[in-house]
Amino acid sequence: MRVENCIEVDYHVLTDYRQDLSARNATLDMRFVEATEKDEALRTKRRWFTSLAWDRADKRLYCGQTHRAGQLLHAFDPSTGAFEDLGFDEVAEDNDMKIHRGLWLDEDERALYFGLATLSSVPALIEAPGGRLMRYDIDARRFDTIGIPLPGNYIQATSYDPVRRMMYAFFEPTKSFAAWSLEEGRLVRAHFVDSIVHVSDVDDDGGVWGTATGRHVFFRYDPSDDAMTLPEGCVLPTARQASGILYGGAGPVDCLINGGDGFMYVTTGLGELYRLDPASCELDYIGRPLPWLRAPAIRVGRDGYLYGVGGDNGMTFLWRCDRTSESFEVLGRVAAEDGTACFRPHDMVLAGGTAYVAETDSPGRSGYLWECRGAVGEKPRTA
């Protein structure tokens, strides 16, 4: 695939940790937790970017990360290129190792909401308290624990509903789902669902979507009547083929967002894009913008187009979709002029005309924050 880059790409380094990946040391990348227990430099310096949230008011980017020593949250200032450690390590517990997916900014409250994930083995989690739902007060610079929905389980993804004051969590290792009322400060319900999404969102009527059973069918939870339904026939046609690609045991959904046009948009581990109608529960296949696996993040741009990032193993590309014509345009590869390339994208946010991409799982070095200028059009698309 030949692509002429329409974007200007740079990367930002928080901790420049590098590692010899000779055959003798290659296993350090494979056994991250075990290795960090023996290597202080690896424990404190090695990190990956996993979740992003853009603050329009302060023009700062909040960055959730994977970090063995608990430094999981930083603020990035694009005007200076500087990162600020927000001090999560002061409240971190033993198994708190990442903000995997779901870093939600409530602009009215000036607060961030997220859940805590782990890399610990199952034996290490037997006596563990479980992943916490967290709130960070930006102005007070304070972390508060909202609650622990499922003891012994850690939170791979969250969804946040500021209107109905709800948080939703998707868990490993049991592949469960939980609904938490922020208003009442309690767990509303929790279920083993035998599938897991990478990240999800809430539809216009307040329903949150996930996948369940070995077939990875969609479910919808509606907090207004505390109802959880599995609509008949609402399943991705490639659900089984797309499963297990994100990581072992993962479901097919790489990203699911509210498109702001009455529909939900779904990407899969195969890199496909679908439109989901919450009213009819029908799924329409739009296309596959790249010839590689993965599409971990999609966002709606200021011009009305749908923007995505996908690819893997150093072949990471930005693309956009005209939802009216269902056509795709590949904007360019996420790679800098010095030859450094984004190894594996994990999240993306749009800030004006710029796309920021979180990089994870990069072998031999820490992950970087990627800045792709000129990615997003300036004016709303006209019909």
Language model features: what each stretch is:
Residues 60-63, 112-113, 166-169, 207-210, ...:
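Conserved beta-propeller blade signature
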